Amino acid sequence: MDFNLNENEQTIRDTTLKLASEFNDDYWLEKDKVGGFPEDFYSKFAEDGWLGIAMPEKYGGAGLGITEASLMMQAVAESGAGMSGASALHMNIFGLKPVELFGNEEQRQRFLPPLIKGKEKACFAVTEPNTGLDTTKLKTKATPDGNGYVVNGSKIWISTAQVADKVLLLTRTTDIEDVRKPTEGLTLFYTDLDRDRIEVREIDKMGRKAVDSNMLFIDGLKVPIAVSYTHLTLPTNREV
């Protein structure tokens, strides 16, 4: 197997490394001391079109793949930005793949372009206080309510929730005792991060202060039916 980069991959790596290197060690040292999302760093990558590297062209992306996106993220981390820089960008790049793969066309047109352009930020809310990495045991519950769902529960170690406009939220819509397999009965929502219904409480850390980590306390969050999707258990013949 040939692990050498082709010309296009090398160009992506070189260009993004050069761009990220405009933000030197002093910039990241200051961010790590005082905290605060690296808005200018994020905006620069958005302006140059890199946030859509792995998204289809029809939604404003570059139409490339996960390999190219990974090379970009490696270059960002190598530049001195480390995990702070990578974590500031990764949700926009990778996080809405479920929308691309499983959302309907109206949802893709509505949700993907603002994230690709950097006009919206999102966080990914899966991990819970008492479930660790066993995602099937999560307790956050979404209950049908008229034309949508009402969500209650808690999440932990959720990055960028202090600055996010949207949240990609994994919930249980059928109790684990009532499903054939623990991977069933899970529903993924992409919706507004309504701070009247979601308390975002930052967790103090010893490092990586440029990107906040948080606990979320969700109390009666209403999600319209139009923004939900339930296709989390893929058919065995489906390739992703």
For the regions a protein language model found, what residue spans apply to each?
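Cytochrome P450 C-terminal beta-domain/meander region
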Residues: D134-N152
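A short, Trp-centered hydrophobic/proline-enriched beta-strand micro-motif
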Residues: G118-V126
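Short Ser/Thr-interspersed hydrophobic loop/turn segments at strand-loop and sheet-helix junctions
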Residues: G49, M72-A77, L170-T173, T191-R195, ...
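Amphipathic, small/basic residue-rich leader segments at the start of a protein or domain
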Residues: M1-L89, K97, E106-K117
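Conserved small/polar residues in nucleotide/adenosyl-binding loops
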Residues: T230-T236
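A short core secondary-structure module
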Residues: N152-R201
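Flexible, small-/acidic-enriched active-site or ligand-binding loops
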Residues: K137, D194-L221
